[in-house]
Design a protein with these regions (language model features):
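Active-site-lining helix/loop region of Rossmann-like oxidoreductase modules
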Residues: 165-229
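Hydrophobic Val/Ile/Leu positions in short beta-strands of Rossmann-like dinucleotide-binding domains
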Residues: 12-13, 82, 169
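A short helix-to-beta-strand connector/capping loop
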Residues: 55-66, 140-143, 190
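Short beta-strand and adjoining strand-loop segment in the mid-core
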Residues: 119-127, 132, 158-175
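Rossmann-like NAD(P)-binding element
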Residues: 64, 68-105, 112-117
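Rossmann-fold dehydrogenase core element
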Residues: 126-150
Length: 229
């Protein structure tokens, strides 16, 4: 059984976007962690944070949600979620690198995709996966974990909707993986499943294209997720 982690500060870099919003809302509703929203525009971050805190409070949560410019948000947190498009990952890590301390954890949920008339396809970066790219760019003392790739943002943000989905977690640092899995498990209805090291991240990121294609082909599956049994 995963232990619930002690109260932490979780930063969502790019936290005004859809996946950042969904994760922020779930953690604010279901946990007592402090949620820090990061954006290149601090005013947008503050507005989003106030909105998320208000929404969570309607579910009885006393969560603290604050908003800052990305580097300041990263400086305030121990776990930093890179909720940015894959083509911004490297520049985002470089922009916050001076705010990262040894032992902080970077979590990458992004997947490289391309779209044509047939649908979505996996398009990993030259590093092999977005998670590997993040690990290549991150400071040496800051472990990177891949998680939350295959979650539907709409389902996350719909707080009345039970999640009942799994998230695959990859990483090479055991403690960072354990911490990330514990944080994931604290979201009601979300089950983290360890899937191996960063070397297999490309396969997991590629599932995102499969899920989007299924969702776009089946109206009743707009916010589908995966469960492993």
């Amino acid at each position: 059984t995963l232990q619930h982690s002690p109260p932490m500060r979780i930063a969502l870099i790019g936290g005004t976007g859809a996946i950042g919003a969904g994760l922020a809302l779930r953690w604010a509703k279901d946990t007592d962690h402090e949620i820090v929203i990061g954006s290149r525009d601090p005013e947008r971050a503050r507005e989003a944070a106030a909105d998320y805190q208000q929404t969570a409070s309607e579910y009885g949560s006393a969560a603290k949600v604050t908003g800052f410019e990305n580097a300041m948000a990263a400086d305030r947190a121990e776990v930093i979620i890179l909720a940015v498009p894959p083509y911004h990952i490297a520049a985002t890590i470089e922009a916050i690198a001076d705010s990262l301390a040894a032992g902080d954890i970077l979590v990458s949920p992004a997947a490289g995709l391309r779209r044509d008339e047939e649908g979505f396809h996996s398009r990993p970066p030259s590093a092999g996966s977005v998670t590997q790219l993040a690990a290549d760019v991150a400071p040496a003392a800051v472990p990177v974990v891949g998680a939350f790739h295959n979650l539907a943002a709409g389902r996350l943000a719909a707080l009345d909707t039970p999640l009942e989905v799994d998230t695959l977690v990859v990483g090479d640092d055991d403690e960072a993986v354990r911490t990330t899995m514990a944080l994931a498990a604290e979201i009601d209805g979300l089950r983290p499943v360890y899937a191996g090291g960063i070397g297999v991240a490309a396969e997991i990121e590629g599932l995102t294209a499969v899920l989007i294609n299924i969702a776009e082909s089946n109206a009743e599956m707009a916010d589908l997720g995966v469960r492993f049994r």
